[in-house]
């Protein structure tokens, strides 16, 4: 079973796998561990990763990058509107209202969803992992920003499904970094001791995230998270791009922003310049040849000037740092270390700001680029039964408060309740109790829209179906389980109606109105921490809730506490009936569309595979043409007649011309046939060359064998001690075989020497190898027969007592046996104790 962690970044992606030796970040086909988050569409196939990155300028309109932030967002979303101006490709509104990506693929215009494009990237990363692991990859853990909302997380989950992956967990990027940091630490405080608080700062290409985590031995708990969703490396790039657009506009009279390709080239150069300035404080040049209208442009920039231009960006570094301390109620002195990851944290001014805020040196023990993917791979290993990993519990948080709203018959309007406050532990489940006579709907939403980097606070609507009143017409008790799962996605996971069965009829006063007023009842399911914080109810409500919960579990015993003492109570039994729930999720792909996209992805993968095979076949023909043309005038020259060489050279030239004309776009089989046709002419020449190279070596080996056996025959005839044990008949056989081999070799050598190099050889290397094997099989067993061993005469023992017991020792065997028994008894007891020691 494969264990894979995927860091799905805005600009680049990383894949890590768990192996017996630990976690390893794997390289792609370009021997690069970083795969660009880029997909390019062509007339025949798609290019993904590094191959697509190389087409950003040449195929700008059909090369998609920076699509990560379109997940779960409508076309009318303000963020999408703001991004339009930065994109070289077109985005469109899909029939569902979501953002689509418009490209030309297979010679026709196509609109792809963000999920589909992300699935293409995931398929590539999956293929990379499979090529390294040599087995199928299905289970994985994928990283997402900690600020992703429910809709965005569901969208990424759909993308993993389209790519044929089983995502075991969507892991927050800062939590993955914390796991990669903590799981290897041997000096963490014990569970009963004060935890070690560590801040993790991740500034990538598009966003800035901060979290503070508490570590104990074998335990990680996220205390708080904060973020700036638009502050990242690309913002610093934009500062440089805008500066040089203005400078070159004045200096060279160029309107750079009107030309997409020019702007993309400038963006690439500015990114390189930014990285150089991180290591260099001096003036650095920026030069681009034939930039626009065949004009070469150049400019300079230094770190000091760059930082002045970035003052407003650098001012945004501190607020999230201050926010996590406020949320977690920690002081700067309580922070043990500050770990930084992400490409943009390499900017000296960013590091300086963070270090100055906390008043301590920053820690860089983690790989800034690969920490997230390593954490994801570790999480996948923890979740996978195939790996035994040190126990390490991870408690994440809910980034935004989540509330439920429902229609309240008692209040003749709507009621709401905050189910999961901000920074509530996750994953987590709670049970709410409602009293209803008919189906009802729960509306989930984020209750703090001002903190939400998303325009719509709605999450979903959940309709609880088939709710019926009790047999006496009173409201039924409905228990609804709500959950934030391991992916950070909220759901109403189940609903159950509690049926009351009475053993005898009796009229009892029903407190319908009171029950209606106490519709919302909540209890924590399974997990104990945060119970008091997570139930903001009055003591009276808590008491009513506990009594009500006990009623559902203990039956009639507690019912007496709720009813007036004068009313005689019937014997009551309860049972639960699961209720169906209909979900209406915000911007969620329906199952039918998901199935269609999965099928389309499979077809596109097959098309890419066929196109690759076609190109490989074409390249094989071209490669063969160049190889043979060079060798015909080189090492193969002596092995082909002049006429044949001229004819073959002409054929090769015709094939080369055909490749660039009529043969430029042919089916795979045409190239296969063309290569076979060329090889019928070229292979005999190649064979003659190879035979000529190998034949002398094999004849030399055969000659050495013959010489060796002749030497043995001579020694045998001279009756040397080494061979006197050999049988004369056998040696005659050896002599005969050796003489025959010598005659065969001399005959073939003479014939071959008379043969022209341009003709096929008289004797082939396979025949010589067979003759060597034949001679060895006959002669070697005979001459290597060992001499018979001569055993020395046995000597009489001088002392009989050394060979056994003597007179008077008749009882010794018993004694020895007893001693032996005593000796063996001790290990026996030890053996019995061994398992206990192992268990301890």
Curated annotation (Swiss-Prot):
This is Heat shock 70 kDa protein 4. Coiled coil: none annotated. The modification Phosphothreonine is found at residue 538. It comes from the Eukaryota. Residues 514-533, 788-801, 829-840 have a biased composition (Basic and acidic residues). The keyword Nucleotide-binding applies. The lineage of its organism: Eukaryota, Metazoa, Chordata, Craniata, Vertebrata. Belongs to the heat shock protein 70 family. Interacts with TJP1/ZO-1. Residues 500-575, 781-840 are annotated as: Disordered. The modification Phosphoserine is found at residues 76, 393, 415, 546, 756. Induction: Up-regulated in neuronal cells upon ischemia. One of its GO terms (molecular function) is ATP binding. SUPFAM superfamilies: Actin-like ATPase domain (SSF53067), Heat shock protein 70kD (HSP70), C-terminal subdomain (SSF100934), Heat shock protein 70kD (HSP70), peptide-binding domain (SSF100920). The modification N6-methyllysine is found at residue 773. It is found in: Cytoplasm. PROSITE patterns: HSP70_2, HSP70_3. The modification N6-acetyllysine is found at residues 53, 430.
């Amino acid at each position: 079973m494969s264990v894979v962690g995927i860091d799905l970044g805005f600009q680049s992606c990383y894949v890590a796998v768990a192996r017996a030796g630990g976690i390893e970040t794997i390289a792609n086909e370009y021997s690069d561990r970083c795969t660009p988050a880029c997909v390019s569409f062509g007339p025949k196939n798609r290019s993904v990763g590094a191959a697509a990155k190389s087409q950003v300028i040449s195929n700008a309109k059909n090369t998609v990058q920076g699509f990560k932030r379109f997940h779960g967002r409508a076309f009318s979303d303000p963020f999408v509107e703001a991004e339009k101006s930065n994109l070289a490709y077109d985005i469109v509104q899909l029939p569902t209202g979501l953002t689509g990506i418009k490209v030309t693929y297979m010679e026709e215009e196509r609109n792809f969803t963000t999920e589909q494009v992300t699935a293409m990237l995931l398929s590539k990363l999956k293929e990379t992992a499979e090529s390294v692991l040599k087995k199928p990859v299905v289970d994985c853990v994928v990283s997402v920003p900690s600020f992703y909302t429910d809709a965005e997380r569901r969208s990424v989950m759909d993308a993993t499904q389209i790519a044929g992956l089983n995502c075991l967990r969507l892991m927050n990027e800062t939590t993955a970094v914390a796991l990669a940091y903590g799981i290897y630490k041997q000096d963490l405080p014990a569970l009963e001791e004060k935890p070690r608080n560590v801040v993790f700062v991740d500034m990538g290409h598009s966003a800035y995230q901060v979290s503070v985590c508490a570590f104990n031995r074998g335990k990680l708990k996220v205390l708080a998270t904060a973020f700036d969703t638009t502050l990242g490396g690309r913002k610093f790039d934009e500062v440089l791009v805008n500066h040089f657009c203005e400078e070159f506009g004045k200096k060279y009279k160029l309107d750079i922003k009107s030309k997409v390709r020019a702007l993309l080239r400038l963006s690439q150069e500015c990114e390189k310049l930014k990285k150089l300035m991180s290591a260099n404080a001096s003036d650095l040049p920026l030069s681009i040849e034939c930039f626009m209208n065949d004009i070469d442009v150049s400019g300079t920039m230094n770190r000091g000037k760059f930082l002045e231009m970035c003052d407003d960006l650098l001012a945004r570094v501190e607020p999230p740092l201050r926010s996590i301390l406020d949320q977690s109620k920690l002081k700067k002195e309580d922070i043990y270390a500050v770990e930084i990851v992400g490409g943009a944290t390499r900017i000296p001014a960013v590091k300086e700001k963070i270090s100055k805020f906390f008043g301590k040196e920053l820690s860089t023990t983690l790989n800034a680029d690969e920490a997230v993917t390593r954490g994801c791979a570790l999480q996948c290993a923890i979740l996978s039964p195939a790996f035994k990993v040190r126990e390490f519990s991870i408690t994440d948080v809910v980034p935004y408060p989540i509330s439920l709203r429902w229609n309240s018959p008692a209040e003749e309007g709507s009621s709401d309740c905050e189910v999961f406050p901000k920074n509530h532990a996750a994953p987590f489940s709670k049970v709410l109790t409602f009293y209803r006579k008919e189906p009802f709907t729960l509306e989930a939403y984020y209750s703090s829209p001002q903190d939400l980097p998303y325009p719509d606070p709605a999450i979903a609507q959940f309709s609880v179906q088939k709710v019926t009143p009790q047999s006496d017409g009173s409201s039924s008790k409905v228990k609804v389980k709500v959950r934030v799962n391991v992916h950070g996605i909220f759901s109403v996971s189940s609903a159950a109606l509690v049926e009351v069965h009475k053993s005898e009829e009796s009229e009892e006063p029903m407190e319908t109105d009171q029950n209606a007023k106490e519709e919302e009842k909540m209890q924590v399911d399974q997990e104990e921490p945060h119970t008091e914080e997570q139930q903001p109810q009055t003591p009276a409500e808590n008491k009513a809730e506990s009594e009500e919960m006990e009623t559902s579990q203990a039956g009639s015993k507690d019912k007496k506490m709720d009813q007036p003492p004068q009313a005689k109570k019937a014997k009551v039994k309860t049972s639960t009936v699961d209720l169906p729930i209909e979900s209406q999720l915000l911007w969620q792909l329906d199952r039918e569309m998901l199935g269609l996209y999965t099928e389309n992805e499979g077809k596109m993968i097959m098309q890419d595979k066929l196109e690759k095979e076609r190109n490989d076949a074409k390249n094989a023909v071209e490669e063969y043409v160049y190889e043979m043309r060079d060798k015909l005038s080189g090492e193969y020259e002596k092995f082909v007649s002049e006429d044949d060489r001229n004819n073959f050279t002409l054929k090769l030239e015709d094939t080369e011309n055909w490749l660039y004309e009529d043969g430029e776009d042919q089916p795979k089989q045409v190239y296969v046939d063309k290569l076979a046709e060329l090889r019928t002419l070229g292979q005999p020449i190649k064979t003659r060359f190879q035979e000529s190279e190998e034949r002398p070596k094999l004849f030399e080996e055969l000659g050495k064998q013959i010489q060796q056996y002749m030497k043995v025959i001579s020694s045998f005839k001279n009756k040397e001690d080494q061979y006197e044990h050999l049988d004369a008949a056998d040696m005659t056989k050896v002599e005969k075989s050796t003489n025959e081999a010598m005659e065969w070799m001399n005959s073939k050598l003479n014939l071959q020497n008379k043969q022209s190099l341009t003709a096929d050889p008289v004797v082939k290397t396979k025949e010589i190898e067979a003759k060597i094997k034949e001679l060895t099989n006959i002669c070697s067993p005979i001459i290597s027969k060992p001499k018979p061993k001569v055993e020395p005469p046995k000597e009489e023992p001088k002392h009989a007592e050394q060979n056994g017991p003597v007179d008077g020792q008749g009882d010794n065997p018993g004694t020895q046996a007893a001693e032996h028994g005593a000796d063996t008894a001790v290990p026996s007891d030890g053996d019995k104790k061994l398992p206990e020691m192992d268990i301890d």
